[in-house]
Design a protein with these regions (language model features):
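Short aromatic/hydrophobic-glycine micro-motifs
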Residues: 78-82, 171
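Catalytic cores of NTP-dependent nucleotidyl/adenyl transfer enzymes across multiple folds
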Residues: 108, 114-171
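Short, flexible turn/loop "capping" segments at secondary-structure junctions
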Residues: 2-5, 50-54, 98
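Helical scaffold of the NTase/Pol beta-like nucleotidyltransferase catalytic core
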Residues: 1-41, 163
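Short amphipathic alpha-helical segments
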Residues: 7-9, 55-59, 102-104, 122
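Conserved catalytic core of two-metal-ion nucleotidyltransferases
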Residues: 81-114
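Short amphipathic alpha-helices in soluble, non-transmembrane regions
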Residues: 71-79
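Active-site nucleotide-donor binding segment shared across nucleotidyl transfer reactions
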Residues: 28-70
Length: 171
């Protein structure tokens, strides 16, 4: 299952199809963005094998400068990848959606910036430390019940634990 109604929260067990789907979208992005995309990685909870996640694939695209992506807004739109201005601080944010069902979040970040580092470190740390992944999973599941109809509050509720895990990952 991939996709979730915009604004809602529902977590499902990890699914193998997420990795394959992410690889397919990464391939499309590489073709569309060419050398502007310095690296493209599957990130977020769907890239962490042992935890529940919203069935929305997160992909991080590294660029030299955030402005480098702006000429591609129309090209991406033609592929149903829509620009969402100001959605995430410090990055350019796109969504793939079908009506009100979101399937992918695409985060454009500076290659050597904090955003890129955090996406990769968080994913790698939780994949390498199952006990930390389970702790995060338990927290997420409680938050998902509490904020089932308010994705913004759900996301905000996770910031402290994400910060703690990133601090550990970067030690």
């Amino acid at each position: 299952m991939i996709g979730l109604k915009s604004g809602t929260v529902k977590l499902v067990q990890h699914q193998e199809e997420w990795h394959e789907n992410a690889e397919n979208v990464i391939s499309v992005l590489k073709q569309l963005l060419g050398d502007t995309a310095l690296d493209i990685q599957h990130v977020g909870s769907t890239a962490i094998c042992s935890i529940h996640a919203k069935p929305i694939i997160d992909i991080a695209v590294a660029v030299h400068d955030i402005k480098d992506i702006l000429p591609y807004i129309e090209v991406l739109k033609q592929q149903n990848i829509f620009f969402h201005e100001g959605a995430v601080a410090g990055e350019v944010f796109f969504v793939m959606e079908d009506g009100d069902i979101r399937t992918h979040h695409i985060h454009i970040v500076k290659r050597n910036g904090t955003g890129w580092s955090n996406y990769i470190s968080f994913r790698d740390y939780l994949n390498a430390n199952p006990e930390k992944a389970m702790m995060y999973d338990e927290f997420k599941r409680k938050s998902a019940v509490r904020f089932a109809d308010d994705r913004k509050r759900y996301t905000a509720s996770k910031q402290e634990i994400i910060g703690q895990l990133l601090s550990e990952a970067n030690m």
